[in-house]
Amino acid sequence: MGMASGVFELNYGGKTLNLKEIKDYRLIEYGDLALMGEAGRPFLPVDNVLIAISSDQEPLGIEILKIEAETLRSVMPPPAPPPAPLVKKPDPFPEPDPLVYGGTGPYPSRLVEIAGTGHLFGQKVALLRVNVGRYLPAERSVVLLKALRFRLKSRKARDDGSRCRNADFVRKVVLNPEDVRVFAKNGDLEYVVITSESLSDEFEPLVRWKRQKGIRAEIRTVEWISSNYSGRDLQEKIRNYLKSAADSGLVWVLLGGDVSVVPHRIAFAMNSGANIFSDEDSIPCDLYYSDLDGTWDYNNNGVFGEVGDSVDLLPDVIVGRAPVETGSEASLFVDKVLHYEVESPEGYLNRALFAGEYLDWETDGGLAKDFVVGELPDGVQVCKLYERFNNLDAASFIDSINSGFNLVNHNGHGSIQVLCTGPDAIYPEDFQDLSNYPRLVGLFYSIGCWTAAFDYEDCMAEFFVLAQEGGGFYVGNSRYGWYTQYFPGYGSSDIFDRRFFGFLKSSTHRAGVALALVKAFMAPASRAENDFRWNEYTLTYFGDPEMPLYFADPESLRLEVAGNLNSGLVDIPVVLEAGEAPVPAGLAGLSDGQELLTSGYSDEAGFVLLHADLTGLDSVLLVGSKPGLRPVSRWVSVMEGPYVAVDTFYVSDENGDGYLAPGEAGTLHLSVVNEGNSDLYSLVAYLAPTDSLISVSDTDFAVGDLPQGATAGAEFPVVASQDLRDGVPTRLVLRLVSSLVR
């Protein structure tokens, strides 16, 4: 099954079903699924599904092959209330639509709907909505989907030339991760800071750290971009630059400045109907710099992001913003990023502070927070300040942050310079006076209205990020947040919130990645003028997009280098470990302290082989990193003289397949080369196992003399243990001993 056959399966059987009585209705809570419905129509579980398809494939329809479902009899779901901005006064409980509740056919009429297609990090995807719950009004029953097998029917279309650029991210969202393939080659740039010439020096330490870690990073000034790229304004020029850079391997984008430095794009999702601010429907939207398909103004009317503008809402790069205007603010932001990643103290990183107030007299934000608690990584301890518990107010909230919390989640009202805390509120001076340093908040997430309105002079998010002695990093709304009256946890802002933390746990522990993935996941629900589309535009991340978050006190990485480093072209064997275990998928970077020389990711045994030219260098810096572990740095001296590296190796075994099976004997053949600048004499190779999975019966082999540039072989009899298994790494240590003279 998969892309080749077009046949796919969904399974909901493991989800917990909860029927909750509300008025004369039964609310159907089904695992982590969202509840959706048009106003007055049944409020039912819905799933969003993304399917990776080929670039020359165009979906036509859905063929249902098999359905497993449960019928919930004598169950009438409540009518959905209209979505409401968090400033709206509560309406009466919604009246049911008589055309649906008095009808005869199922609602919704279709089990699966195709919402469109788009490109996620270059991968073409089909966007589907699955109506997991369907109401049968004539029987007063709900049919609840348990499993589904279907075919995505499609036709051959013109190849649009799209190619996946980041399979790891795409695979976390699509139904068929096995069909995702990376076609694009890595370029010379993975991370970029876009800032002004006047602020570029302040961002240099951050870029230097990225290079030291092994990430190809640069600074691009808005002045340089404006002079070298076309566009109707600076925003479009920046976006056109990002388009070309994304095609060459760009992943991470830090917008290094407030709107006076890196201008924002205003997007239109819909009319909110709040009628409070004249610019309330003009959403400052950094998704414009992340979703790089099209122009966002297809009809060329100067209004960006309209449904008719063919915005696919799927990110192509990961974006964060540093809301800084001065050199001192930029330095403060950079210092906080470096401090959090490298020096965060222990004792608070597994602590989360959840605040929930009554959004109205019928809607308890604390209940919405309880849904999010279930999405947190194991071991995270949650402190709940809920208006329902009578323990939420401004003083307790600020005191708690100052005591040290890594994650903060706020479900409450807000405005440009207000963040509400039940009976009272927090104001700019409260954030400015925070004193939680060195225990910076890795992530503060709020669904409150306007707290991240970064197009205004200063908003609450900016005060938090730029607090001199504390604060941290922030995700919030640049305009209204949205809720569903009477149904806490099921408003669109709640749904984004919950899914965000789910992706944060399952992705690369990066807030920027989680925000990109939740926007991709919600795209099938956001293709119309609705509050889901609004959330796509309004949610903004103030932080470094590549910075990983901790969820516990981190173990420190250990970095081992086999042998000495010699001048010239050399292979450098590096092993990454934590505790007593190897670290797979860790990044090892080699630099001269300023410029990146080479980098690579470790295999299952924690091993990575770096190849670099060390000519003219006295020492190099090795850095090992992996999200969730504390990075390690080590300066290593570069020596003149011989340098022996393993060139090739293979196994000749009893059955001739080149793989050692459990209990099988064979010979390990090694080829070594002298890549240094002098000769070696009387070289002897010693091979030793590090565990019982492989035994070596004759552990030394006399290689002989090895002149500069020469290659020689060595052979070792080996036997595999009966305990050897596929996917279980084992390590052999090769030691080479020689003389520099005859």
Where are the model-predicted features located?
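Cysteine-dependent hydrolase recognition
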Residues: 1-635
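Low-complexity, acidic Ser/Thr/Pro/Gly-rich terminal tails and inter-domain linkers that flank the onset
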Residues: 554-561, 639-662
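Short, solvent-exposed loop/turn segments enriched in Ser/Thr/Gly
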Residues: 568-571, 662-669, 712-714, 728-730
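Short acidic/proline- and small/hydrophobic-mixed sequence motifs that coincide with surface turns
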Residues: 582-584, 677-683
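Intrinsically disordered, low-complexity Pro/Gly/Ser/Thr-rich segments with frequent PxxP/GP/PP motifs
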Residues: 599-609, 695-724
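Extracellular Ig-like/FN3 beta-sandwich strand-entry sites
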Residues: 615-619, 665, 725-731
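Terminal connector regions
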Residues: 624-640, 719-742
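Asparagine-centered strand-capping/turn motif at beta-strand->loop junctions
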Residues: 672-676
